[in-house]
From Swiss-Prot:
Pathway: Amino-acid biosynthesis; L-histidine biosynthesis; L-histidine from 5-phospho-alpha-D-ribose 1-diphosphate: step 3/9. Gene3D superfamilies: Phosphoribosyl-AMP cyclohydrolase. One of its GO terms (cellular component) is cytoplasm. Homodimer. Mg(2+) binds at residues 77, 79, 81. This is Phosphoribosyl-AMP cyclohydrolase. The gene is hisI. It comes from Pseudomonas putida (strain GB-1). It is found in: Cytoplasm. Transmembrane segments: none annotated. Its EC number is 3.5.4.19. GO terms for molecular function: magnesium ion binding; phosphoribosyl-AMP cyclohydrolase activity; zinc ion binding. Catalyzes the hydrolysis of the adenine ring of phosphoribosyl-AMP. Belongs to the PRA-CH family.
Length: 130
C-alpha cells in the first residue's frame, strides 16, 4: 500500500501549502506551510502543526497564544499540491493580529480596506499565560 504522504506533490523545499478553514462555516482562517513531519504529526495529534519557514522549525498552532486548531478533516486537492485542514479554532482567533481570520482585508477602490475587527489585543494574546 502506498504511503499517503507520498501522494502529495511537495515543492522543491519539501513543503505544501496548507489552508485552514472553519469546519462549521467554511471560512478561510489562514494559510501556512507544512512539511512531511508536520503533516504526519497533524494527522496523529489531531491538531494543526505547521512548518515555520521563518523560524525553520515545527509550529504547533496555539503553542504561544492558546489558539489551538483542532483537526476535524484533512483534504487534498485534485493536483495533490494543496492541503485543506477543516478545523475548530479554539478562542476564535486564528491571526496573530488578534482577528478571527488572517484574511481581514478587502480590495476596494484601488486599496486594501480592513473589514474585520481585532477581537483581542495581540500584546495580551502573546503575554505570559495568554
Amino acid at each position: 500500500m502506498k504511503d499517503w504522504l507520498d501522494e502529495i506533490k511537495w515543492n522543491s523545499d519539501g513543503l505544501v501549502p496548507a489552508i485552514a478553514q472553519d469546519h462549521k462555516t467554511g471560512r478561510v482562517l489562514m494559510m501556512a506551510w507544512m512539511n512531511r513531519e508536520s503533516l504526519a504529526l497533524t494527522a496523529t495529534e489531531q491538531r494543526a502543526i505547521y512548518w515555520s519557514r521563518s523560524r525553520g522549525k515545527l509550529w504547533r498552532k496555539g503553542e504561544e497564544s492558546g489558539h489551538v486548531q483542532k483537526l476535524h478533516e484533512l483534504r487534498l486537492d485534485c493536483d495533490a499540491d494543496v492541503i485543506i485542514l477543516m478545523v475548530e479554532q479554539l478562542g476564535h482567533i486564528a491571526c496573530h493580529t488578534g482577528r478571527e481570520s488572517c484574511f481581514y482585508r478587502v480590495y476596494e477602490d484601488g486599496q486594501w480596506k480592513i473589514v474585520d475587527p481585532v477581537l483581542k489585543d495581540p500584546d495580551a494574546i502573546y503575554s505570559a499565560g495568554h
